Amino acid sequence: MKKFNFRKVLDGLTASSPGSGSSSGSNSGGGAGSGSVHPAGTAGVLREEIQETLTSEYFQICKTVRHGFPHQPTALAFDPVQKILAIGTRTGAIRILGRPGVDCYCQHESGAAVLQLQFLINEGALVSASSDDTLHLWNLRQKRPAILHSLKFNRERITYCHLPFQSKWLYVGTERGNTHIVNIESFILSGYVIMWNKAIELSTKTHPGPVVHLSDSPRDEGKLLIGYENGTVVFWDLKSKRAELRVYYDEAIHSIDWHHEGKQFMCSHSDGSLTLWNLKSPSRPFQTTIPHGKSQREGRKSESCKPILKVEYKTCKNSEPFIIFSGGLSYDKACRRPSLTIMHGKAITVLEMDHPIVEFLTLCETPYPNEFQEPYAVVVLLEKDLIVVDLTQSNFPIFENPYPMDIHESPVTCTAYFADCPPDLILVLYSIGVKHKKQGYSNKEWPISGGAWNLGAQTYPEIIITGHADGSIKFWDASAITLQMLYKLKTSKVFEKQKVGEGKQTCEIVEEDPFAIQMIYWCPESRIFCVSGVSAYVIIYKFSRHEITTEIVSLEVRLQYDVEDIITPEPETSPPFPDLSAQLPSSRSLSGSTNTVASEGVTKDSIPCLNVKTRPVRMPPGYQAELVIQLVWVDGEPPQQITSLAVSSAYGIVAFGNCNGLAVVDFIQKTVLLSMGTIDLYRSSDLYQRQPRSPRKNKQFIADNFCMRGLSNFYPDLTKRIRTSYQSLTELNDSPVPLELERCKSPTSDHVNGHCTSPTSQSCSSGKRLSSADVSKVNRWGPGRPPFRKAQSAACMEISLPVTTEENRENSYNRSRSSSISSIDKDSKEAITALYFMDSFARKNDSTISPCLFVGTSLGMVLIISLNLPLADEQRFTEPVMVLPSGTFLSLKGAVLTFSCMDRMGGLMQPPYEVWRDPNNIDENEKSWRRKVVMNSSSASQEIGDHQYTIICSEKQAKVFSLPSQTCLYVHNITETSFILQANVVVMCSSACLACFCANGHIMIMSLPSLRPMLDVNYLPLTDMRIARTFCFTNEGQALYLVSPTEIQRLTYSQEMCDNLQDMLGDLFTPIETPEAQNRGFLKGLFGGSGQTFDREELFGEASAGKASRSLAQHIPGPGSIEGMKGAAGGVMGELTRARIALDERGQRLGELEEKTAGMMTSAEAFSKHAHELMLKYKDKKWYQF
């Protein structure tokens, strides 16, 4: 007996009501509304045949790992026993690094900048001081660190912290010059305070300034060295509570470091000098040097230099000490880069850096400050890089960094993410890329080797591809939540280098970064790789293991089209689409080759933006350029940037489009098959009756005004924002911009995994793009999209001339954001936003599948173009390919973003592909060779009838059509108040689903083909442009986005991966015995000073020091224990962890009970003793003696 489905009854009732397919409302958060439609009787049959296995229990959103260099770093710390490194940032983030695979990200909820970090050495804890004057204690003994305690200072600002080795008391210096002491275990302030007016001499009337240094003496832990900004240093006796000695210097102090014997210390000053002080003669420096100052005549002071911001004085047992400092260069060398100076004996080595130095630390063999330090490396934290210098070799080489700290080497402009790739790809790419690695690194192992990490159970090959502003492409191995660079491709090598002065003549669309990558398409199976750049070019690459020297083939395409500005009908009104399959004339095919002619003073025509190399080029193994396609200038108009891209290795065809039209190129025969304006694709069935016209002279100016007036109501400072350069997205000052405004700024799209995902226009390719629109002379738009974006039309309108404030004001008018249908949406210019190759049904009456190209536009229109390929394999290299619009039209609300197809059983159909073969393998070329094309097995053996689903997603809704009948089976209005930025059809647990990322921050998952909502989570309440332009989904529940200019954030929407995440993360803390201190020897202990320890608890505890004022600091309990349980519960050891915590809590309560019992017994004994004494006292007295 067949199971009764009540939902189908409701769906049938819904279908019978008018407008049921598109009238569903949106939720309160601007998320999803839904409606289902099945107009034809066949739909109900198909729905019964498909058993959807996905349920909402399969989905959950969770951040997994963050890769890249910490954005805007501010602080650095190192645990010499655990060998882990911590980096704090200006945004309140902390990154903790260990061995490769051990990479943890933490975030302060307040978002305040991290001022300083201090490890509790070998105890699995970290103290952070933030700019909101709060101290935090982090527990590192769990995979997801959490805050245990916080201490908020209310009346003083924190400037410096110091935690002695194996001490439980933290010294905290403040801006007022006072020094407070905090108990690390309880995070409570001690009553012991060193006031600034008691530390300095009574005769001194001026304030010494903030505390810039605190450290205890290596010889005597009872003595504290306090450095003040104005040049005063105080040696404070903690026991006697008085200053033992004071040091005064004319120049401000930046840092201080001890000699390990505790008899001398070194200071760095603002005049570029280093002073060495001896405790026995504090009246003047024992030695004063200006390392980079010019030597003057006798009697004159050396020339002052730039401040030395930090100095470290490290001793060696068998060699001269190391003096390492940053800064201190001479002022006359203004052009010199930031440097780190290493002084070892008489040798002075200056290491120049590419970026300003934020902080550095010397790594030493021992954690004990009173032993020979034996430094072996220096960690240098730069503004945009992290390097480690090997001190054990005389030439001071750097270590090869195993972390992906160079993602931002050139600003990232687009990303692509591929999960479950062919397993041999990673090895192949690595073997090619390793040959091009830099040489000269240290041969020692990476010194930051702490923590523990294993692969985990859930591993499959994953590859991330990033496109960059300099035209480079990087392939990354992203398997097992790690990231390692495999291979780097430089696309700029196919072009001639621009000579000085040539840029304005031929490349006016972009002055800076003309090679910036917009879109990426990659077919892992065929290894075909294709990119489009900001200068309106497309390059097709083929992979080869052999080096070749050959000429680069190039084609030039004219793709410039204009129409009359006729107001279009409302997008909600779906016009009729007649079947024109029988009456369409043959398509117009334009020759793609043109002669490049340019002369000064003549209107530019048929000139590409870049010049392809004409001489033979040596191409190393890896990806080698097969064909370069460039759009050219037409009648003085620059080519529009490409907004959509798709490649089919099986068909040997590449298609791309922009706001003017569509171009289709045969990259096997190197010929242009189609170069047509968007209107011509409709032919006689143009729904909006637009007429072609010749290009107008002031087109760009009109477009500028037209778009500006619609945007001026959204943001008052729009003119300035629209003209921000492309680098504004990738600079370090990353200021969020409202996405609703961003919607109006980006007409192009982003593509991932062969499908498009973009805010307004999109194409079927695998990557994201940085879109077009030239603004005046500067035309560098942020990673992935152009400067503005239209909701329903004209997604690629150019902006080339500036708009004055008066013009902007005149053209502006008031309208609500909800009414997206306005004049800006009704322009007749229609951009190609999505492309997709698939074997499908081009027309209604087709009975067999054939090669097709699906074309989506910014007006929500979908056109199917039929591809007629030669039948015989040998003829494919000689016979022409016919390209013909089929006359089939489908419509949606909003710009089309992505396509996909499913078979009648609900299986996701993959486009056909050609099996990879090395094009330069001599052995294979000698044999008779035929192209081996892999077709989708399910699509190749289907019977006649409605047996293919086509999934189409736009900015507003998703629809599922049955082909060839073109019946709309399902429609889902995803959002009404917002719009979709990224969409992709992905595989999850062997089933297909539609994943969407909305401008309001919602991530939504829908099952296919029914489009039932599976997940709707408000993941990013405060989104910004960078996230919107780089967000991409892939299979197996994975996604990523560029969270900052230097970091990639990966997340999962898979419940299974969320459950197993704890097992995949690395351990930050591993049990290691603390090394024993060296034996000082009898004589050294006798004459070397009082090196014995003293009881800090007795000195700083409440019993002797009293309680601190409650108004001075506020203790805030942290969520560490709760977070620790949540983190442990996610792994296999969750139950054991909970049991252990319960036992610990029970043991703690029993311990407290035992203490109370012991206290009561003590009290009882005291009472008994007192009663006995009282009895003895009055035992022999008479009654009258009382």
Swiss-Prot record:
Changing residue 1043 to I: Found in a family with autosomal recessive infantile-onset neurodegenerative disease; uncertain significance; loss of axonal outgrowth. The modification N-acetylmethionine is found at residue 1. WD repeats lie at residues 74-107, 114-153, 158-194, 213-247, 253-285, 307-349, 357-391, 413-490, 518-629, 643-705, 832-889, 898-969, 974-1018, 1032-1055. SMART domains: WD40. Phosphorylated, leading to STXBP5L increased turnover and subsequent de-repression of insulin secretion. Phosphorylated on serine residues in response to glucose or phorbol esters. Keywords: Acetylation, Cell membrane, Coiled coil, Cytoplasm, Exocytosis, Membrane, Methylation, Phosphoprotein, Protein transport, Repeat, Transport, Ubl conjugation, WD repeat. It holds the Pfam family LLGL. Detected in kidney, hippocampus and lung carcinoma. Residues 15-40, 748-771 are annotated as: Disordered. Residues 16-26 have a biased composition (Low complexity). The keyword Acyltransferase does not apply. The keyword Transport applies. It is a peripheral membrane protein. This is Syntaxin-binding protein 5-like. It comes from Homo sapiens. Residues 748-769 have a biased composition (Polar residues). The gene is STXBP5L. Belongs to the WD repeat L(2)GL family.
